[in-house]
């Protein structure tokens, strides 16, 4: 079957109530999309891809992956919480929300510069090439100018180490996004979590439109977007399709797409949710790879619970980034020694910092820091 035809540069409107049972699913014989331009899929087309038998889907996604990426190269990222707990949002999965009184977590103040710099040094020495910093707040607008300047200085210092820098700080204004870019930020993470239809069951203190407004501010500043979602929130397959449709029809495909498996933290409203299976994650990875062929697809939270076989299939189907280190914000992560053994068994190698990315903004085409100044390298 031929690949669905290329769409215009403007994403199509969401498809609602449209029957897809008669649509032919993607097959392993489908040629991979051209690496020269993005293809926008309708929601019904993404549903047809998602519903393809898993082995056929993984095979087709692997062909797309190899057309756009070195299949043996995997990016290694480290994520650090620079401000833990006390968040005013009520996201049902999050241990850092101040609404969830039963969670055993003590709120902390914004970290100092030296401790963050030392953590980045350790991450670089361990082989990470991207350092991500997360703060549990609604957004920088809720903190004072001195704290905001401290965050900007964190970005500058980590960037000065020759590492890619990502932050996840909640909702941004266009002015804040521009300041982060000026400080040397590589990418900004702001997950949309799930589909527009299911989002009200995840959070009531902000809207899906709030999420999209931050992504628009980030893209408007020329900063690369890192945006993904969480599998296991109680959503159905249609919501997973809706999540991927939202991401795949942004004005530009995200530079990075994190696929998280819910880590059910005791004391949160979602503590009793059953975890997604490894094959659920593989299906989402493979679909993301087909519909966003040039984006980096990251195995993120919950990877510790995936078997080596699940991870191997995910890498085959298009995953090409992981978080390493023993912790992701407040939850446990896969062991670095286990990762080294898995990479060795699969013949994987680490992606160097500052290779140009196939998707994302200008900040993903920026070279290494030389003498404190940023040197631009166009793809």
Regions found by a protein language model. Give the residues of each.
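Functionally engaged cysteine thiol sites
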Residues: 2, 87, 91, 132, ...
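Auxiliary Fe-S-binding modules of radical SAM enzymes
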Residues: 2-10, 18-73, 248-379
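Glycine-/proline-rich flexible loop or hinge segments
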Residues: 44, 74-78, 97-105
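Hydrophobic faces of well-ordered beta-strands that scaffold small-molecule active sites
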Residues: 74-79, 131-133, 165-167, 188-190, ...
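Glycine- and other small-residue-rich loops at beta-strand/loop junctions that grip anionic moieties
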Residues: 80, 169, 207, 229-232, ...
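Local cysteine-cluster metal-coordination motifs and their immediate loop/turn environment
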Residues: 80-98
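Conserved Radical SAM active-site core
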Residues: 98-228, 233-249
């Amino acid at each position: 079957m031929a690949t669905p035809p290329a769409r215009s540069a403007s994403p199509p409107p969401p498809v609602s109530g449209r029957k897809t049972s008669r649509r032919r699913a993607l097959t392993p014989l489908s040629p991979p999309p051209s690496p020269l331009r993005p293809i926008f899929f309708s929601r019904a087309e993404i549903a047809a891809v998602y519903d393809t038998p898993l082995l056929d889907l993984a095979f087709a996604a692997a062909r797309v992956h190899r057309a756009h990426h070195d299949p043996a190269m995997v990016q290694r990222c480290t994520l650090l919480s620079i401000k833990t707990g006390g968040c005013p949002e009520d996201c049902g999965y999050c241990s850092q929300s101040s609404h969830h009184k039963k969670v055993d977590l003590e709120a902390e103040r914004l970290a100092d510069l030296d401790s963050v710099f030392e953590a980045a040094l350790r991450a670089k020495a361990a082989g990470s090439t991207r350092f991500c910093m997360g703060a549990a707040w609604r957004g920088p607008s809720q903190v004072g100018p001195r704290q905001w300047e401290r965050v900007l200085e964190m970005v500058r210092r980590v960037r000065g180490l020759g590492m890619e820098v990502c932050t996840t700080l909640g909702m941004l204004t266009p002015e804040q996004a521009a300041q982060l870019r000026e400080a040397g930020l590589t990418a900004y993470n702001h997950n949309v979590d799930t589909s527009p239809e299911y989002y009200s069951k995840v959070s009531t203190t902000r809207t899906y439109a709030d999420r999209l407004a931050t992504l628009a501010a980030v893209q408007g500043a020329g900063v690369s977007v890192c945006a993904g979602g969480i599998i296991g929130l109680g959503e159905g397959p249609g919501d997973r399709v809706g999540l991927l449709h939202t991401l795949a029809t942004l004005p530009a495909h995200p530079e990075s797409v994190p696929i998280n498996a819910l880590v059910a933290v005791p004391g949160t409203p979602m503590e009793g949710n059953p975890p997604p299976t490894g094959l659920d994650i593989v299906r989402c990875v493979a679909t993301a790879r087909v519909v966003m062929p040039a984006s980096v697809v990251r195995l993120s939270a919950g990877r510790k619970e995936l078997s080596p076989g699940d991870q191997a299939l995910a890498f085959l189907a298009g995953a090409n980034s992981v978080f390493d280190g023993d912790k992701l914000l407040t939850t446990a992560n896969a062991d670095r020694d286990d990762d080294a053994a898995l990479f060795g068994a699969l013949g994987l190698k680490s992606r160097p910092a500052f290779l140009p990315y196939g998707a994302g903004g200008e900040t993903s085409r920026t070279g290494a820091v030389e003498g404190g100044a940023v040197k631009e390298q166009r793809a």
